[in-house]
């Protein structure tokens, strides 16, 4: 091999190593159990930009993206220490929120409120009570409102995990 070929080969090897390192999962606070990682991989096989963080007493939250790079969809999935999925929160553009959900909001006491952001969050829960959460401004106050698929519009609920 010529000297130039050796340099090119070395540069390619370094570049490949950097790409592999950049695509690896990132772990905060240690590494989740194999059960947790396996359940996540089963549920979200195409996930990328994956970052794990311990949450509470041995539970885990994983932030990740799906879809086309570089502008994927942001998600956060929550797992208990045994690898059981608890909930996933997905960022959704307001334009992509189903019309019936928007209608429920417009027919509620929050009809005069303005959207604070250009997106909402979609919560999928283990119990199946899925809902959209909106950040609104009403009467000069910031409020969060949940709208479920049955048309119930309520102030934001907390404590799912």
Per-segment meaning from a language model:
Residues 1-11:
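Bacterial N-terminal signal peptides that target proteins for export
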Residues 2, 31-161:
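First exposed extracellular module after export/assembly in secreted or surface-exposed proteins
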Residues 15-16:
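Repetitive helical segments and hydrophobic/amphipathic motifs
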Residues 19-23:
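C-terminal motif of bacterial Sec signal peptides marking the signal peptidase cleavage site
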Residues 25-28:
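Bacterial signal peptide processing site
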């Amino acid at each position: 091999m010529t000297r130039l070929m050796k340099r090119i080969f070395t540069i390619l090897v370094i570049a490949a190593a950097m790409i592999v390192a950049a695509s690896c999962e990132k772990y905060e606070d240690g590494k989740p159990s194999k059960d947790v990682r396996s359940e996540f991989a089963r549920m979200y096989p195409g996930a990328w930009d994956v970052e794990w963080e311990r949450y509470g007493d041995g539970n885990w939250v994983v932030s990740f993206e799906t879809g086309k790079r570089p502008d994927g969809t942001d998600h956060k999935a929550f797992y208990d220490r045994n690898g059981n999925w608890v909930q996933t929160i997905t960022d959704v553009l307001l334009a992509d929120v189903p019309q019936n959900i928007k209608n429920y909001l417009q027919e509620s006491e929050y009809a005069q409120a303005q959207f604070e952001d250009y997106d909402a969050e979609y919560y999928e829960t283990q119990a199946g009570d899925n809902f959209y959460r909106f950040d609104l401004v009403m009467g000069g106050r910031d409020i969060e409102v949940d709208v479920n698929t049955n048309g119930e519009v309520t102030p934001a609920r907390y404590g799912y995990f």
